[in-house]
A protein has these predicted regions:
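Extracytoplasmic metal-acquisition and chelation regions
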Residues: 1-187
Length: 187
């Protein structure tokens, strides 16, 4: 908690998931390319070329998210799950409510929290409630059953299934699905 002048504490939630923002992912790609070039100078030009191409794709992805947000009916998103997406939401000026703070190790939200989220979804007429990859969608489903909101996956790009790994799924592919699902929730 940080104390403010008015005497109220403000909780600061740290989130190590910096890659959830495509803008940050673009910076990370640049740093990785630089380090690889330093360690393997013979292939520095290849690293730089590949990085530039990938950064162009990340710029396009960022533009897609900005387009979705610019046409949104709302800025509030509800997660029936943990919330490792602070950098993403900060980047696009979105607000959220979640069943758990940050990446809590809790596995069951309090009944009061679920009731609050149900009320918020009803009050704001939110059409979708999200859950994360490799996580139980049960809380999102409960909220959906009570409100008519559609439970949808929002991928933090932190984990993939064995099948996704074996098939070579990429960050860009996972984030493209997020573009589609976010659009549904903000409409």
């Amino acid at each position: 908690y940080l104390d403010e002048d008015d005497g109220h504490g403000v909780e600061i939630e740290y989130d190590e998931h910096i890659w959830t923002s495509p803008v940050n992912a673009k910076k990370l790609a640049g740093v990785l390319a630089e380090v690889l070039a330093q360690e393997d100078p013979a292939h520095a030009a290849s690293y730089a070329e590949n990085c530039a191409s990938y950064q162009d794709k990340l710029t396009e992805l960022d533009a897609e998210f900005r387009e979705v947000v610019s046409h949104a009916k709302r800025r509030l998103v509800v997660f029936g799950d943990k919330f490792p997406l602070r950098y993403f939401f900060d980047e696009y000026g979105l607000e959220y409510r979640a069943a758990f703070s940050g990446c809590s190790t809790d596995t069951e939200p309090r009944a009061k929290t679920i009731a609050y989220l149900i009320d918020k979804v009803r009050e704001e007429q939110i059409p979708a409630v999200y859950y994360l990859e490799l996580s139980s969608p049960r809380v999102a489903e409960i909220i959906g059953e009570e409100t008519g909101a559609e439970p949808l996956l929002f991928h933090s790009c932190h984990n993939v299934t064995r099948h996704q790994f074996d098939s070579g799924v990429t960050y860009l592919e996972l984030m493209e699905q997020n573009v589609k699902n976010l659009k549904k929730g903000l409409s």
